[in-house]
Amino acid sequence: MNELTPPPEALTDPNAVEFARIWAAHRQQHVSLRVEQWKHNPGVWGIMLSDLAHHVANAYEQEGVGTREEVLQAIVSVFLAEFAEPTDAPTGGMVD
């Protein structure tokens, strides 16, 4: 497997929790989520998605692939288009 290394802060915090994993396998996207942490406030996922977009934009800028603003604009544009007219219908269920 080709896993990412956890962030250093996660390794030093005994209360750290992983709440999402996204994999590409067999030419499809596969996701594992821990939703119980924000079970009564699903809107918090909107903050997480926004934070993730900003991290991606920072990474692209550091790699020299456009400015942070250009990358964020591209992410938001495609997100809104995909949200309005999905190109896929995620399936699956809860497992332990």
Language model regions located:
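Solvent-exposed interaction surfaces and binding hotspots enriched for charged
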Residues: 1-96
